[in-house]
Amino acid sequence: MSLARGHGDTAASTAAPLSEEGEVTSGLQALAVEDTGGPSASAGKAEDEGEGGREETEREGSGGEEAQGEVPSAGGEEPAEEDSEDWCVPCSDEEVELPADGQPWMPPPSEIQRLYELLAAHGTLELQAEILPRRPPTPEAQSEEERSDEEPEAKEEEEEKPHMPTEFDFDDEPVTPKDSLIDRRRTPGSSARSQKREARLDKVLSDMKRHKKLEEQILRTGRDLFSLDSEDPSPASPPLRSSGSSLFPRQRKY
């Protein structure tokens, strides 16, 4: 049977093997009854014939399915080809700007004649255009040279500012400050305003030197500098030393 037959042929081809298989089985039964002397040989021949019939039916069935599958696939290729044929070309600017009637714009012949006559007479045509007002120019970006010129000016202004003393100012030879040991309590009748005090490094250094000097004086004489200034001992009398227990309890002599 050929594989190119239609649906009717495939149905007939499937029905024919079934009838043949029935005939084969009936023939096998008849052979089994008649051939009593060689049952093994007849049974082997019957099995071979049965297997051959089954292989033929399987081949025909698979061929029919392939034929049925080819029919819808051929029909499905047609819409795919139609889809691939769909294409579009965008319109040009002139086609988009066409008027409603579809004809391109063209000046009337009388206007064309008038313009040619003006060109022949005057040589040039006056441009008919609306002159729009001008806007102010855009300020130009500042160049790097101008910026570099402005930076020294800013530095000069900073240098011209008066220097304010701070606690970190240091002089090689600090000026000895005034005596700051005087009690600065406000006396009755004086102004309540107090002078603003600023911390300066030279003052800190001078205070350190003064305290060191006081310590050396106390260690050398055993008396405080204030007591020496307040008392006026006579030069003949020896200096009175205070007991070491009052000033230096740890420096007693035994």
Swiss-Prot record:
Major localisation: nucleus
Domain of life assignment: Eukaryota
Region (Sufficient for interaction with NCOA1): 116-160
Subunit (UniProt): Component of the KMT2 family MLL2/MLL3 complex (also named ASCOM complex), at least composed of the HMTs KMT2D and/or KMT2C, the common subunits ASH2L, RBBP5, WDR5 and DPY30, and the complex type-specific subunits PAXIP1/PTIP, PAGR1, NCOA6 and KDM6A; PAXIP1 is required for the association with the MLL2/MLL3 complex. Forms a constitutive complex with PAXIP1/PTIP independently of the MLL2/MLL3 complex. Interacts with NCOA1, ESR1, NR3C1, AR.
Keyword annotations of the record: DNA damage, DNA recombination, DNA repair, Nucleus, Phosphoprotein, Transcription, Transcription regulation
Protein name stated in the entry: PAXIP1-associated glutamate-rich protein 1
Tissue-level expression: Ubiquitously expressed.
Modified-residue entries (Phosphothreonine), positions: 138
Biased composition (Acidic residues): 78-98, 142-159
Residue ranges of the region described as Sufficient for interaction with ESR1: 161-254
Biological role stated in the UniProt entry: Its association with the histone methyltransferase MLL2/MLL3 complex is suggesting a role in epigenetic transcriptional activation. However, in association with PAXIP1/PTIP is proposed to function at least in part independently of the MLL2/MLL3 complex. Proposed to be recruited by PAXIP1 to sites of DNA damage where the PAGR1:PAXIP1 complex is required for cell survival in response to DNA damage independently of the MLL2/MLL3 complex. However, its function in DNA damage has been questioned.
Any one GO molecular-function label of the UniProt entry: nuclear estrogen receptor binding
GO cellular component: histone methyltransferase complex; MLL3/4 complex; nucleoplasm; nucleus
Pfam family, one: PAXIP1_C
Lineage per the UniProt record: Eukaryota, Metazoa, Chordata, Craniata, Vertebrata
